[in-house]
UniProtKB/Swiss-Prot annotation:
Binding annotation for ATP: 221, 228, 243, 273, 312, 385, 391
Record's protein name: DNA ligase 1
Active-site residues annotated for this sequence: 223 (n6-amp-lysine intermediate)
Its job: DNA ligase that seals nicks in double-stranded DNA during DNA replication, DNA recombination and DNA repair.
Cofactor names: Mg(2+)
Organism: Thermofilum pendens (strain DSM 2475 / Hrk 5)
Pfam family, one: DNA_ligase_A_N
Origin organism lineage: Archaea, Thermoproteota, Thermoprotei, Thermofilales, Thermofilaceae
GO process annotations (BP): cell division; DNA biosynthetic process; DNA recombination; DNA repair; lagging strand elongation
Family: Belongs to the ATP-dependent DNA ligase family.
Amino acid sequence: MALFRELVEAAEAAGRVSGRKEKVRILSEFLGRLSPEEASIAARFLAGHVFPEYDNRELGVGYSLVREALKVLDQKPLFLVEPQPPAITEVYRLLERIAGVSGEGSREKKLKLLEGLFSRLSRKEVEYLLRILFGEVRIGASTGLLLEAISRLSGVPYGDVLHAYMVLSDVGDVAFKALESPAALGKVDVSLFHPVKPMLADMAYNVDELFQEHGSPLHLEYKYDGLRVQIHMGRGKVRVFSRRLSDITEYVPDVVERAVEGLHVEEAVVDGEAVAVIGGAPVPFQELLRRVRRKNEREDFLKSLPFELHLFDVIYLNGKSLVREPYSTRSRLLREIVVSEEILAKKTVAYTRQEALEFYESAVRSGNEGVMSKRHSSVYKPGIRGSDWLKLKSFDTIDCVIIAAEWGHGRRSGWLSDYHLGVYDEESGRFLSVGKTFKGLSDAEFEEMTKRLLQLKVREEGYVVYVKPEIVVEVDYSEIQRSKRYPSGFALRFARIRRIRFDKSPYEVTTLRELRERYLRSIRAKRWSPQ
């Protein structure tokens, strides 16, 4: 039975070497010594997760509770026999128990469980455990490194391992299958009622760029400002999943109704956007959510919203995965299973620059964000952002995660209101700062954000509160600049929060690679114009 101590030693060993191949070797050899269950848990821990990414359980362990539990380290009797160090599986089971504690007296129960766990760990092991709990940094490797390690130990090609991860949505599940049945890992595919990560789009800055990348003709769709939904239908059931893979079926009855009425099919998994419509016009969904402050209130609010459904892809049909089929085939099959094309995203084929511009302008006039262009030959790549899909928006933003916040002054005194913004570095598995801003939110949002951020507090230094990277915000900016001040090497000029993205996970934010690409493009074209 592998000890948690061994995981920490492997993480430290991987952290000490600089070469990617050597990191992969260390992680591969460590995971290869474990049972499938142990490897599953260890892979998640090394990636900075306790539970699978699609698992909505929360530990509910805050900074103050941890600080109190840490006192047990200073109270260990020196004359007693050292307690048995916990196995990796024991640590996981204890964290499961902590997540399951609720109701009256839950804080005291969680405290006792944490104290019991901390008392069996060394200070170094506690440090690593806290980094897992707070998601402060990935403790051993980025997900990419772990997938390479899994490929090495299983002998399964990296492309197949990556595909399995995108379908299973959990590096732990991939590690389990790699050790239990490597041959089966290469056959993992989309299945009914198991949500997969949605395919994502790169940003384009003008119509000419769409033609340069995708050629003529362009296959364009409206880009809606709604709720990304993945709908699974079959066996007499309908399930709706969010982009974070949460089951939101009960909160969107309109979406379920429109799917049942609009699709004529035995089994299917379709991808689309649910758009809130008030007074016959689309309303920016995230703007509506800004009015609702608490999570349970947001869920009730969702139920009350009238939604229209706009489908744009089908990735599973009557027992067969379609993710390896070209977009042209998937688009045709989607048209064949809808009762009426009203349920489809509005599309066109543009042969000329003028036709593309007119479609873009009609999308914006209709209250939408812009347009999407999709390469006709592209396969569906779950969880992958790339140039096969390009989005052209009427405004330019990036998604950042809040990694720290500062106490405000003057009118904002008493609120955490100056937010440190981070992008994701895929190489290191860390979130790196690109600047900070206090602009864009209302007083009510400052108040609610202060409560949420304090619940996510990891530590406090002076007037800066460092938090678990959990809250995603969409950020406007005027320019990306080179900067030695921030670890990312870049800074956002005149950053302003456009909206809070409750629907996005921290690992969906803009990556450092994407930010670097935007910076290089901005050198060529300082001011963006759709024309």
